[in-house]
From Swiss-Prot:
Cofactor(s) this protein requires: Mg(2+)
EC assignment: 3.1.3.11
Chain positions recorded as Mg(2+) 2 binding sites: 111, 114, 259
NCBIfam families named among the record's database cross-references: PRK09293.2-4
Pathway where this protein functions: Carbohydrate biosynthesis; gluconeogenesis
SUPFAM superfamilies referenced in this protein's UniProt entry, alphabetically: Carbohydrate phosphatase (SSF56655)
UniProt-annotated location(s): Cytoplasm
Binding sites annotated in the UniProt record for Mg(2+) 1: 90, 111, 113
Protein name as annotated: Fructose-1,6-bisphosphatase class 1
Protein species of origin: Citrifermentans bemidjiense (strain ATCC BAA-1014 / DSM 16622 / JCM 12645 / Bem)
UniProt keyword terms in alphabetical order: Carbohydrate metabolism, Cytoplasm, Hydrolase, Magnesium, Metal-binding
Enzymatic class: hydrolase
Family: Belongs to the FBPase class 1 family.
Length: 326
């Protein structure tokens, strides 16, 4: 968006920027409510209980107290927004219906505190959000109307797309999100890689790909947190994150609905790509809340190379067209 005379980008707040995106008022309101909820989540991260909650989520994973509290914060804000019909969270066992009617409303899938196990060692974590029009959450990620993540690191940053560019905001000392970078774009290829999962459980194609990156002199940059690792690849504009199929875990670890779809939507709108090794992540039709998939996400050429190695050098892997012109 163009700055008004006498206005710097650091004075453009999230609501003002969203209103310039040619989206409806309800979506502006919803995304601002999520941003407001994140302020309470970061307070919980900084001061909250680091112990276990004594419960398990849908996937049988022991929930931390911060997981439960962060989910409660996000869910309450979404319910009271008045513009949400269905909610799905990584911390809930089933879809929560807020309103029966879908007219003008949205469904939201989110991971309230991705990487929560890293908090006790003071590493960066984040919130990931996917938004669809209407009540159906089990649809291809390409149908998202918006996706966003909030990174709780040395700075708190928010990145979003509504299908027209990717934009970064940073929380200032008044806890307001102001524009930092507009229309973030990725290079065709990079020299950073962030490989998740135990390497001794990689299949032959993935192992060959890692050796290829090492021989090229690429830099390994992996924190164990999905949000900070994706943010690094995106903001540097180069590189790739991968969490492949593993021996014993053929679908990898990350969830399509809560993690892969929103991040793939953001990365593609920045000119990158995201694939499960066969098709674009955004073309997967999820059949359940807990569906998982391998992922290769980042610069388009890096993803193309990765999928070629995974498929034994074959080049017929389907790649989505870039959302970014030029």
């Amino acid at each position: 968006m163009s700055n008004a005379p006498g206005t710097s980008k650091f004075q453009i707040d999230l609501r003002r920027h969203l209103r310039a995106q040619n989206i409806c008022d309800n979506l502006v309101h919803l995304m601002c409510e999520i941003a407001e909820a994140s302020k309470y989540v970061i307070n919980a991260v900084r001061t909250g209980d680091l112990g276990v909650a004594g419960t398990s989520n849908l996937y049988g994973e022991e929930q931390l107290a911060l997981d439960v509290l962060s989910d409660r914060i996000m869910r309450k804000r979404l319910i009271h927004s008045g513009v949400v019909c269905n909610i799905a969270s990584e911390e809930m066992d089933e879809i929560y219906q807020c309103q029966a009617s879908a007219d003008g409303l949205y469904s939201v899938a989110y991971d309230p505190l991705d990487g929560s196990s890293l908090v006790d060692v003071n590493l960066a974590v984040g919130t990931i959000v996917s938004i669809y029009a209407g009540c159906d959450l089990l649809q291809p990620g390409r149908n998202q109307v918006a996706a966003m993540y909030i990174l709780y690191g040395p700075r708190v940053s928010l990145v979003y797309t509504v299908g027209d560019g990717v934009h970064e905001f940073t929380m200032n000392n008044l806890m307001e999100f102001t524009l930092t970078r507009e229309n973030v774009k990725m290079a065709p290829e990079g020299n950073i890689y962030a490989p998740g999962g135990l390497r001794n459980k990689y299949n032959a194609g993935d192992e060959k790909f890692i050796r290829h990156l090492e021989e090229k002199g690429c830099k390994l940059r992996y924190s164990g947190g999905f949000v900070p690792d994706i943010n690094q690849v995106l903001m540097k504009g180069k590189g790739l994150f991968m969490y492949p199929a593993l021996n014993g875990s053929p679908n990898g670890k990350l969830r399509v609905l809560f993690e892969l779809n929103p991040m793939a939507f953001i990365i593609e709108h920045a000119g990158g790509a995201a694939s499960n090794g066969s098709i674009p992540i955004l073309d997967i039709v999820p059949e359940s809340l807990d569906q998982r998939a391998p992922i290769y996400i980042g610069c388009r050429e890096d993803v193309k190379t990765a999928t070629s190695f995974v498929n034994g050098g074959k080049q017929e892997v389907k790649m989505a067209g870039s959302f970014v012109n030029g």
